[in-house]
Swiss-Prot record:
Lineage, top ranks: Bacteria, Pseudomonadati, Pseudomonadota, Alphaproteobacteria, Hyphomicrobiales
Entry binding sites for Mg(2+): S235, T256
Gene name linked to the record: mnmE
Protein's UniProt name: tRNA modification GTPase MnmE
Gene Ontology molecular function terms on file: GTP binding; GTPase activity; metal ion binding
Textual note on the cofactor: Binds 1 potassium ion per subunit.
Annotated function: Exhibits a very high intrinsic GTPase hydrolysis rate. Involved in the addition of a carboxymethylaminomethyl (cmnm) group at the wobble position (U34) of certain tRNAs, forming tRNA-cmnm(5)s(2)U34.
């Protein structure tokens, strides 16, 4: 972001959705907010009370009439003077208002995430809360919304701040033993208690990291891959799950050459289901590429649905992969073997077994995710910094042959790594990347 640290400019942006709409909200933040009111409304409304005013250009022409709210610093989202203008959501109305604001001295259009970045810089939120807001905006399922709301509510911040304070307190005891070993008010050899406390903290962080895998699945989705021989009914199953015709269905074998993916919302959990090229020996170069991609996607899957036509001879062969694999018998309406090999029997012609399979997929997803009620790491940078924290704690605990000064330094570094998660310590290099992921107006 350009000159983002000075905050001398007053920024504005459309914060509501795509135009046209019933109502459009333009947000403003910065030192010229009161000047904007005096110029456009000829009045400054009472703080935090909606006022119905006419919005005018600098030459007095009426742009629109609508509600506006004024939030004086520091009691605002950004910590600066802020305002919201609620206009009718017509394209011409909004474009005119934005053009008028852009002509005012000291005012400019906001960059992506700039409102939230100013809130962070002014101490209105930490990095984890900002990330939670980004995830809340991006949430597409109920599970993703709940997870994002936990983070945006400050649960992570409270946990990491508590851990950091425990490290700081432990380090203070060690340094007190170093500096005041001869003083009567310093307990004799407190270091053993400190190492025990750090060991307990290390186990807490390790358990916390383990829960991050489930959070990542909820945030990024589970991946289910449909495989099988050509004409086993893979595309028909994908179309049923999607609720629409996504894949071409034909009597001709090998019509699916590339990966086809649909996203499902199963009980609030995002699940990506991929149809793949039929697995067989072929001379077709294009089909071979499709089969290679199918095998690569299988290797990344959380669950593989291996389909076989029940109306033909039983010849189930399952490729060796790490993911859980379900054997699904298809075309059950045509009869055939009732072999106990199949986990489910389905028919996309009659609908037999399809709802049971869908219920089973949801149960699988829910079992994988589990109940996420406590604060969990939701991003890879959290996990990386938590692992670095553990590494420094281990050095401090296991450094029996090291001077206490060095072990205290390990504790200082551990607390710094925790501070980087919340943004309390040395995070300037990640700010541009993080806030650029927000939309304009947030």
């Amino acid at each position: 972001m350009s000159e983002i640290g000075s905050y001398h400019d007053t920024i504005f942006a459309l914060s509501s959705g795509r135009l046209p709409s019933g109502v459009a909200v333009i947000r403003i933040s910065g030192p010229k907010t009161r000047f904007v009111y005096e110029t456009i409304c000829q009045a400054i409304p009472e703080p935090r009370h909606a006022a119905l005013l006419t919005f005018r250009s600098r030459n007095g022409d009426a742009i629109d009439r609508g509600l506006t709210l004024f939030f004086p610093a520091p009691h605002s989202f950004t910590g600066e003077d802020c305002a919201e203008f609620h206009l009718h959501g017509g394209k011409a109305v909004v474009e005119k208002m934005l053009a008028v604001l852009g002509e005012l001295p000291g005012c400019r259009i906001a960059e992506a995430g700039e409102f939230t970045r100013r809130a962070f810089a002014n101490g209105k939120m930490d990095l984890t809360i900002a990330e939670g807001l980004a995830d809340l905006i991006a949430a597409e399922t109920e599970g993703q919304r709940r997870l994002a709301m936990q983070v945006a509510s400050g649960n992570q911040r409270k946990l990491y701040s508590e851990w950091r304070q425990r490290l700081i307190n432990a380090r203070a005891f060690i340094e007190a033993e170093l500096d005041f070993a001869d003083e009567s008010d310093v307990p004799g050899s407190v270091s053993m208690q400190v190492w025990q406390q750090l060991s307990a903290l290390k186990h807490e962080i390790e358990h916390h990291i383990a829960s991050g895998k489930r959070a990542a699945m909820l945030r990024d989705g589970l991946h289910v891959v449909i495989v099988g021989a050509p004409n086993a009914g893979k595309s028909s199953l994908l179309n049923f799950l999607a609720g629409r015709d996504v894949a071409i269905i034909s009597e001709e074998a090998g019509t699916t050459r590339d990966l086809l993916e649909v996203k499902l919302d199963l009980g609030g959990i995002p699940v990506y289901v991929t149809d793949t090229a039929g697995l067989r020996e072929t001379d077709s170069v294009v089909e071979k590429i499709g089969i290679e991609r199918a095998r690569a996607r299988m290797a990344e899957a959380d669950l593989v649905l291996s389909l076989e036509d029940m109306s033909g001879p039983v010849s189930v062969t399952v490729e060796k992969i790490e993911a859980e694999t379900w054997l699904i018998g298809t075309k059950a309406d045509l009869g055939g073997s009732a072999s106990g090999l199949w986990k489910y029997h389905i028919s996309t012609m009659t609908g037999s077994g399809l709802e049971q399979l869908l219920d089973a997929l949801q149960a699988f997803a829910e079992a994988k995710i589990g109940q996420i009620e406590d604060a969990v790491p939701t991003r890879q940078r959290h996990i990386n910094l938590l692992r670095a924290t553990i590494e420094e704690i281990e050095k401090a605990i296991e450094g029996d042959d090291l001077p206490l000064e060095l072990r205290a330094e390990n504790m200082r570094l551990a607390s710094q790594f925790l501070g980087r998660i919340t943004g309390d310590v040395d995070v300037e290099e990640i700010l541009d990347v993080m806030f650029s992921q927000f939309c304009i107006g947030k």
